[in-house]
Amino acid sequence: MSISSDTSGSVPGSPIDLEPESETICHWQSCEQDLLTLDNLVHHIHNGTTSNLRLISNINSILDHIGNRRPKYTCEWDDCPRKGMVQTSRFALVAHLRSHTGEKPFICSVPECDRSFTRSDALAKHMRTVHEADTLRPSDPIPKAHPMHPQNVANAMVQSAREARAQQQMHGVGNTNEDVENWLDAASMPKTSHDMYRLQKRKLQWVKEERTMLANHLEALERKLIDARNRKEKILNEIVKQVDPSISR
């Protein structure tokens, strides 16, 4: 997905209220280089170059745009009402320039949604209003008490799988992991990529639980093996002493 996909929301300090169309020409101090794509333009502005140097006709015009570790950062975009005004930081200047370029780096994480935004708060508003994530910001973890918390979803799936496996045992049906895997596939029937993602997370939780159970079983067997070896050594020592008391192991 391109970073120039549709969006809503604007950048504080934007020269216009409407969201700009994606730009490909650099208007920083009359640079006027056409970078052909928004990705190339953003790379050009941020790094003073482009990922495709063959696009550049005047190498001197691409140097020292935003720069790094400068004492002050100002927008030098032609026709910008805030041109020459000092920004609070390089980060603030980068955010401001999105109003000129149309860059939208904040992408909705819902698989079936293709929206992207210039600002993180615009993405948060989209998540609340469109995807009904009322109590969560995009960066917030899902509360453990929430029914959609991965652990709760996984636990419910594991419990259902255990019940199905118990039914299989009662009827003399094999209870291999493959049986449970097939049951999970048949029960879930994912219809969207988001459903598939959730299913795979549930399967991952199932695998982790099985791994923990097997690790505990292995640890118990290793303890039994050590005890058996110790008993063997003790018995062997007793036998050797009886055969030849002068021999000490």
Curated annotation (Swiss-Prot):
UniProt KW keywords: Chromatin regulator, Cytoplasm, DNA damage, DNA repair, DNA-binding, Metal-binding, Nucleus, Repeat, Transcription, Transcription regulation, Zinc, Zinc-finger
Zinc finger motifs (C2H2-type), residue ranges: 73-100, 106-131
InterPro entries membership: GLI-like, Znf-C2H2_ZIC1-5/GLI1-3-like, Znf_C2H2_sf, Znf_C2H2_type
Biological-process GO terms, alphabetical: CENP-A containing chromatin assembly; DNA repair; DNA repair-dependent chromatin remodeling; regulation of transcription by RNA polymerase II; transcription initiation-coupled chromatin remodeling
GO cellular component entries: chromatin; cytosol; Ino80 complex; nucleus
UniProt keyword DNA damage, yes or no: yes
Subcellular compartments: Nucleus; Cytoplasm
PANTHER family registered for this protein in UniProt: TRANSCRIPTIONAL ACTIVATOR CUBITUS INTERRUPTUS
Quaternary structure note: Component of the INO80 chromatin remodeling complex.
Function: Component of the INO80 complex which remodels chromatin by shifting nucleosomes and is involved in DNA repair.
Protein name: INO80 complex subunit 1
UniProt source species: Schizosaccharomyces pombe (strain 972 / ATCC 24843)
Gene: iec1
